[in-house]
Swiss-Prot record:
Its main location: mitochondrion. SUPFAM superfamilies: a domain/subunit of cytochrome bc1 complex (Ubiquinol-cytochrome c reductase), Transmembrane di-heme cytochromes. It comes from Voalavo gymnocaudus. One of its GO terms (molecular function) is metal ion binding. It is found in: Mitochondrion inner membrane. It holds the Pfam family Cytochrom_B_C. GO terms for cellular component: mitochondrial inner membrane; respiratory chain complex III. Component of the ubiquinol-cytochrome c reductase complex (complex III or cytochrome b-c1 complex) that is part of the mitochondrial respiratory chain. The b-c1 complex mediates electron transfer from ubiquinol to cytochrome c. Contributes to the generation of a proton gradient across the mitochondrial membrane that is then used for ATP synthesis. It is a multi-pass membrane protein. This is Cytochrome b.
Length: 380
């Protein structure tokens, strides 16, 4: 008798996606982060749902409702900090996932890669709106500064900003709509993830060597399910250590002060995972130029398949491009540090140099290195 998982219409889909899926036999732990992102997304939706049961999206009570969750709701403090730090874990996994895609040339599966970029934008939008909800000082001023960037759009900018605000400043209407969008977007992300996986299973997974692995496939279960479970345990260990020992490590102390439109904080900055993009935005003196650079800092990823000049897909056997890749990683860490610093010398010039290096490395140096490596191989 045929196993039900292979015949049942619904179970058959799950079977082909997570059980009998043919996977390359040599994929390393860097391939764990896709499943970890799935766990993070589920965790965020579950904790977010419980928080939404007690949260009120009104400017007069939003801050108090978050305090009420932490003080009066059973394990409310745990749910709140799991949600806040879960977002940080989500972005750590996201950055590693994208970094792995860049290192091993996974961007050559163009549909999967482009879907991933759309997902990245959706997650960033969700995280930004979530940061506004506690209605602390940094929530309010972060929302004001970031939404104000749209006013740089010629002709329609100011009208667009006021339309998003629902008035002439960030107020009750803004908070209510941000809560509505923050609630619905994760479910849209789940749908996009399904499309992402659909595209992935059309071509199959890439592997560290960058070579075709059709000749050497193994079933996903039990080999990679057990490997993913180990990754999940390590992720939860790290997350729980963060939540139970230093829950405010990655937050901003200013957000424990209720929002006050009459008092601007000395340094307005977003959460740590947006600092690299914020540094690129600030490094250009022109407002519209800064906004374009901000968007391009993520959109540049869509150009990677077209900038690939090497005959080899992966960087595994390409030492020159490998060096440039790690320079890029160091550059992004520098930008993250600069984004959290005040706008003064020497941080301004460091930010500008790091921003230039970011775009030059991706758009010019890495494609050139690919061609040089190919020529060296021809000569030997």
């Amino acid at each position: 008798m045929t196993n039900i998982r292979k015949t049942h219409p619904l179970l058959k889909i799950i079977n082909h996606s997570f059980i009998d899926l043919p996977a390359p036999s040599n994929i390393s732990s860097w391939w764990n982060f896709g499943s970890l992102l799935g766990i993070c997304l589920m965790l965020q939706i579950i904790t977010g749902l419980f928080l939404a049961m007690h949260y009120t999206s009104d400017t007069t009570t939003a801050f108090s409702s978050v305090t009420h969750i932490c003080r009066d709701v059973n394990y409310g403090w745990l749910i709140r900090y799991l949600h806040a730090n879960g977002a940080s874990m989500f972005f750590i996994c996201l950055f590693i996932h994208v970094g792995r895609g860049m290192y091993y040339g996974s961007y050559m599966s163009i549909e999967t890669w482009n879907m991933g970029i759309i997902l990245l934008f959706a997650v960033m939008a969700t995280a930004f709106m979530g940061y506004v909800l506690p209605w602390g000082q940094m929530s309010f001023w972060g929302a004001t500064v970031i939404t104000n960037l749209l006013s740089a759009i010629p002709y329609i900018g100011t009208t667009l900003v006021e339309w998003i605000w629902g008035g002439f400043s960030v107020d009750k209407a803004t908070l209510t709509r941000f809560f509505a969008f923050h609630f619905i977007l994760p479910f849209i992300i789940v749908a996009l993830v399904m499309v992402h996986l659909l595209f992935l299973h059309e071509t199959g997974s890439n592997n560290p060597s960058g070579l075709n692995s059709d000749a050497d496939k193994i079933p996903f279960h039990p080999y990679y399910t057990i490997k993913d479970i180990l990754g999940i345990f390590l992720l939860l260990l790290f997350l729980m250590s963060l939540v139970l020992f230093t829950p405010d490590l990655l937050g901003d102390p200013d957000n424990y002060t209720p929002a006050n439109p009459l008092n601007t904080p000395p340094h307005i900055k977003p959460e740590w995972y947006f600092l690299f993009a914020y540094a690129i935005l600030r490094s250009i003196p022109n407002k519209l130029g800064g906004v374009l650079a901000l968007i391009l800092s993520i959109l540049v990823l869509a150009l990677l398949p077209h900038l690939h000049t090497s005959k080899q897909q992966s960087l595994m056997f390409r030492p020159l491009t490998q060096t440039l890749y790690w320079i890029l990683v160091a550059d992004l860490l520098t930008l993250t540090w600069i984004g959290g610093q005040p706008v003064e010398y020497p941080f301004i010039i460091i930010g500008q140099l790091a921003s230039i290096l970011y775009f030059v490395t991706i758009l010019i140096l890495m494609p050139m290195a690919g061609m040089i490596e190919d020529n060296i191989l021809k000569m030997t």
